[in-house]
Amino acid sequence: MKNKTHKGTAKRVKVTGSGKLVREQANRRHLLEGKPSTRTRRLKGIVEVSPADTKRMKRLLGKA
């Protein structure tokens, strides 16, 4: 039986050209007026998935 891609993970994580996994940071969708602007600035941009989670994420994406 073929492995299937976990669609929830596929929507949240992208694979770069070099094979790294990147994701958006949480806590920047709503209720922002109660959060300090320093915090919302710090949460900007994309970050690499931690090495502890990379193996599991790749398996969910069907890359390993």
UniProtKB/Swiss-Prot annotation:
Ranges of Basic residues composition bias in the record: 1-14
Protein name: Large ribosomal subunit protein bL35
A Gene Ontology BP annotation from the UniProt entry: translation
Record's GO cellular component terms: cytosolic large ribosomal subunit
Superkingdom: Bacteria
Biased composition (Basic and acidic residues): 21-30
Pfam families: Ribosomal_L35p
Alphabetical UniProt keywords: Ribonucleoprotein, Ribosomal protein
NCBIfam families named in the record: rpmI_bact
Cysteine pairs bridged by disulfides in the record: none
Gene: rpmI
Membership in a protein family: Belongs to the bacterial ribosomal protein bL35 family.
Gene Ontology MF annotations: structural constituent of ribosome
Chain positions covered by the region annotation Disordered: 1-30
InterPro entries noted in UniProt: Ribosomal_bL35 (IPR001706), Ribosomal_bL35-like (IPR021137), Ribosomal_bL35_sf (IPR037229)
